[in-house]
């Protein structure tokens, strides 16, 4: 009997020890460092933190190695947010059974778990941009602000990367649908109180009003209604872009989801101080013609793009056209350039009048289509790598040594991927091709 009691005590001791050991393994500290997860504590980590961003990596993956310092830099910033976001990583090559269970088929795969709900992340990977994107993903669709101080705090926390829409005197229900629909593109909030100081600070003179701020371009606009029948959404969509948009590799991607045609002004050097009067005229014209996008581009800044509009050394600049955003553009008869001899706004107004009256000549762009420009951003180095990989694969297949890949992404995942990458800078976008996710 005594032996049995001793045996039971020993079993109880072992059970307690194992329990204590297991629980200590699952103790996580929110100290701004990247957590290293295993197959034994993964589920516990997901349930412990409201928001956790997990990097599923392989030690041999070059992209994974380059991502490590970015995650290390972002982790302490995200940990200090009002709604902290924990960064963690898991060796999916080592814990392959868990990786297969959650369908990890490429490296690195990045997942954001928001209250346990997973969402694959395809956004930028540089630390500063990663922080901006993750803050946006976990924020409420529409923030409800109670006072002037909370309005100021909201604007400061939003930063300068995304446009900010604040409905003063508007009910949350009026913009909740837009906040949900365009969550990845802008910040949305409503303020219950509308003080005189707030009206002066945000430059509107009555409520209700929806104020749009575009910090990146230092632009501001106000919508006083009507707040139904699509008018509100139209204002929001138009306000995603500034009144006049500098055209470059990154901003071309912003035009991808905008169906409006682009009034494109081509100059020699877009930074030259003599162009301020022209930009002022274009901005005034854009105010009155919100059904069009107004953009400008310099030959010096983006020559390969400008060449597509038949611009050469003999072309008189600034040249102005209406581009359909793809393969064609309209040139207004008799008004091909903006001269210094006449008021700029008068010339731009005459150009728009001629365009709307149909006094135009349609031309094909001299080069790749819009999607061609987007695709060209991967760079010639990536093309060489791709050609080399294709050659290797063909050679191996000819030897009968290559099996068909088992991991195939769904069409839905591809669409989500394109949507999230819309505003990703050029040097980031090339890292998201499936062929880039796994390497020797």
From Swiss-Prot:
Residues 24-139 form the Thioredoxin domain. The record marks 62-63 as: Contributes to redox potential value. It holds the Pfam family Thioredoxin. Its main location: membrane. This is Protein disulfide-isomerase 5-2. Disulfide bonds join 61-64. It comes from Arabidopsis thaliana (Mouse-ear cress). Glycans are attached at residue 171.
């Amino acid at each position: 009997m005594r032996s049995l009691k001793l045996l039971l005590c020993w079993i109880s001791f072992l059970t307690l020890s194992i329990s204590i050991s297991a629980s200590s393994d699952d103790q996580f500290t929110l100290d701004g460092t990247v957590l290293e997860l295993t197959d034994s504590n993964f589920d516990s980590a997901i349930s412990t933190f409201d928001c956790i961003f997990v990097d599923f990596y392989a030690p041999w993956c070059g992209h994974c190695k380059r991502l490590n310092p970015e995650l290390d830099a972002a982790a302490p910033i995200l940990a200090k947010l009002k709604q902290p976001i924990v960064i963690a990583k898991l060796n999916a090559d080592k814990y392959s059974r868990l990786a297969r269970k959650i369908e990890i088929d490429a490296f690195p795969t990045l997942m954001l778990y928001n209250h346990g709900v997973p969402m694959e992340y395809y956004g930028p990977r540089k630390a500063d941009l990663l922080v901006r994107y993750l803050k946006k993903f976990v924020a409420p669709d529409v923030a409800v602000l109670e006072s002037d101080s909370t309005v100021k705090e909201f604007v400061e926390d939003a930063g300068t990367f995304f446009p900010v829409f604040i409905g003063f005197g508007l009910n949350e229900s009026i913009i909740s649908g837009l906040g949900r629909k365009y969550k990845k593109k802008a910040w949305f909030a409503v303020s219950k109180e509308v003080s005189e100081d707030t009206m002066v600070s945000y430059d509107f003179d009555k409520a209700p009003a929806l104020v749009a701020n575009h910090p990146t371009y230092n632009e501001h606009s106000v919508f006083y209604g009507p707040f139904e029948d699509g008018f509100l959404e139209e204002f929001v969509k138009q306000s995603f872009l500034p009144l006049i948009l500098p055209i470059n590799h990154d901003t071309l991607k912003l035009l991808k989801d905008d169906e409006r045609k682009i009034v494109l002004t081509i100059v020699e050097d877009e930074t030259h101080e003599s162009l301020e009067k022209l930009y002022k005229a274009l901005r005034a014209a854009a105010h009155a013609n919100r059904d069009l996008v107004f953009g400008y581009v310099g030959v010096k800044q983006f020559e390969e793009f400008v060449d597509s509009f038949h611009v050469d050394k003999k072309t008189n600049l600034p040249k102005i056209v209406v581009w359909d955003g793809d393969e064609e553009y309209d040139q207004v008869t008799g008004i091909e350039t903006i001269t210094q001899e006449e008021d700029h706004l008068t010339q731009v107004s005459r150009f728009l009048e001629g365009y709307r009256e149909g006094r135009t000549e349609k031309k094909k762009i001299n080069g790749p289509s819009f999607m061609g420009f987007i695709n060209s951003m991967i760079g010639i180095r990536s093309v060489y790598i791709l050609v080399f990989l294709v050659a290797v694969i063909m050679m191996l297949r000819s030897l009968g040594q290559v099996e068909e890949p088992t991991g195939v992404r769904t069409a839905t995942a591809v669409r989500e991927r394109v949507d999230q990458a819309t505003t990703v800078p050029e040097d980031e976008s090339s890292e998201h091709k499936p062929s880039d996710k796994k390497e020797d």
